[in-house]
């Protein structure tokens, strides 16, 4: 098996409860190195919970998570980051009273390789040239689209092998949504594997290699993204297409 075909993330029977609510009901999926994989589903389907479970932000009720064949099920979140997994949470979460540059540097807090950090700063500023024009500007004064770019760029500053993005296009104008999705494809071209959560199912499936459909904590459908785009159930439920 080539490096590109190797499974980088494997989730086995992941279950999560919020009190009496069974939010994830034993889901299993995997991502191969170099892929863009998307989880689509309605609000409350379990998409964000899946990411938080992988990162051990919330307690699991059952199941296993493997990253590069390492069992990370019970590893602390900051240790998972050091292994090469980054999560950009929904809602951007930039530090409003820090400059763009300070926000970016926080993304590399766990790294010691100063020369490589400088190289990666140059790299993310090539990906997001608008941020390079605003390095001294406070994060809170950026537009919504610019804050989203900053959140993604900060996630890249830890040089992840796997980047997990939770609703990166949420609340953005259509032109900015297109720009965000194009940037995600560029990031993949740089060798970063991506797990993408999106309510914009059409946009996500257009750029993804493979997709999983979540409903009420269960994976009800999976397949190559181009196949899901023409699936009648997906088209009616998530793409707004009537047949």
Over which residues does each language-model region extend?
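Glycine-rich phosphate-binding loops of nucleotide-dependent enzymes
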Residues: 2-243
């Amino acid at each position: 098996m080539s490096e590109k075909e190797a499974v980088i993330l494997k989730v086995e029977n992941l279950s999560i409860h919020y009190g009496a609510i069974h939010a994830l009901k034993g889901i299993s999926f995997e991502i191969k190195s170099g892929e863009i994989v998307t989880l689509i589903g309605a609000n409350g389907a379990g998409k964000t919970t899946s990411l938080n479970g992988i990162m051990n932000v919330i307690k699991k009720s059952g199941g296993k998570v493997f990253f590069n064949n390492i069992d990370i099920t019970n590893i602390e979140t900051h240790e998972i980051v050091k292994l090469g997994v980054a999560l950009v949470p929904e809602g951007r979460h930039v530090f409003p009273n820090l400059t763009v540059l300070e926000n970016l540097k926080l993304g590399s807090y766990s790294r010691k390789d100063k020369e490589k950090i400088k190289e990666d700063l140059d790299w993310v500023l090539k990906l997001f040239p608008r941020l390079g024009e605003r390095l001294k500007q406070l994060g809170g004064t950026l537009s919504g689209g610019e804050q989203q770019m900053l959140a993604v760029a900060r996630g890249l500053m830890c040089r992840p092998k796997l980047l997990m993005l939770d609703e990166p296009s949420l609340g953005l104008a259509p032109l900015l949504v297109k720009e965000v999705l194009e940037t995600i494809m560029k990031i993949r071209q740089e060798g970063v594997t991506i797990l993408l959560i999106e309510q914009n199912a059409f946009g996500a499936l257009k750029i993804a290699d493979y997709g999983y459909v979540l409903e009420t904590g269960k994976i009800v459908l999976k397949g190559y993204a181009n196949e899901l785009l023409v699936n009648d159930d997906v088209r009616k439920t998530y793409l707004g297409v009537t047949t």
